Amino acid sequence: MKIVEVKHPLVKHKLGLMRENDISTKRFRELASEVGSLLTYEATADLETETVTIDGWNGPVEIEQIKGKKITVVPILRAGLGMMEGVLEHVPSARISVVGIYRNEETLEPVPYFQKLVSNIDERMALVVDPMLATGGSMIATIDLLKNAGCHSIKVLVLVAAPEGIAALEKAHPDVELYTASIDKGLNEHGYIIPGLGDAGDKIFGTK
């Protein structure tokens, strides 16, 4: 599995600000979107382009345009919505597929409860976004769902990832690509990433 820890100074700086315990909902939400945008820039660096001719101000001009598979952005509800706008800044014409999966706090197992995928998803590249890759259960369940629907070109974008989640994802889906702003130390006894970001969903939506 291709694993990319994005080490750009802007990514590290913005992620560091997100780790502040008393950060406001507004600021956390803004930074989640901004880091999501920067991760998208990295994740789409290998997209193929083609030369096309358009009408320029002084006659025909050749330009480069992205070719190949169309894109669907797949936020995992609910926290993934906090990264979605940042992703769409770079791929504004992408279709949006939504997957709802929550983690049972006692068993740590993923529980699917909603899905709405775009048509012709088998012809698209999926950018799956979720702030945290902890145990990997929710991400694996989401990718299972996408593959069952025919989508096999999948890239995962997360703000922070635990080594345990990375190992689980690689074992289940070695063909996906992972882009993260940080590979953190690991999980605590409750399955939360350390140092992590706390509950990203609560911080994005202002709930407890």
Swiss-Prot record:
Quote the catalytic activity from the record: UMP + diphosphate = 5-phospho-alpha-D-ribose 1-diphosphate + uracil
Q: What residue ranges carry the coiled-coil annotation?
A: none
InterPro entries named among the record's database cross-references: PRibTrfase_dom, PRTase-like, Upp_B, UPRTase/APRTase, Ura_phspho_trans
Q: Which cofactor does it need?
A: Mg(2+)
Q: Name one GO molecular function term.
A: uracil phosphoribosyltransferase activity
Specify one Pfam family: UPRTase
What GO terms in the biological process aspect are recorded for it? UMP salvage; uracil salvage
Q: Where does uracil bind?
A: I193, G198, D199, A200
EC assignment: the record states 2.4.2.9
Keyword entries, A-Z: Allosteric enzyme, Glycosyltransferase, GTP-binding, Magnesium, Nucleotide-binding, Transferase
Write out the pathway annotation from the protein's UniProt entry: Pyrimidine metabolism; UMP biosynthesis via salvage pathway; UMP from uracil: step 1/1
Activity control, per UniProt: Allosterically activated by GTP.
How the cofactor binds, per note?
A: Binds 1 Mg(2+) ion per subunit. The magnesium is bound as Mg-PRPP.
Residues at which 5-phospho-alpha-D-ribose 1-diphosphate binds: R78, R103, D130, P131, M132, L133, A134, T135, G136, G137, S138, D199
Q: Which family does it belong to?
A: Belongs to the UPRTase family.
Report the protein's function: Catalyzes the conversion of uracil and 5-phospho-alpha-D-ribose 1-diphosphate (PRPP) to UMP and diphosphate.
Protein name, as recorded? Uracil phosphoribosyltransferase
Species source reads Citrobacter koseri (strain ATCC BAA-895 / CDC 4225-83 / SGSC4696)
Taxonomic path? Bacteria, Pseudomonadati, Pseudomonadota, Gammaproteobacteria, Enterobacterales
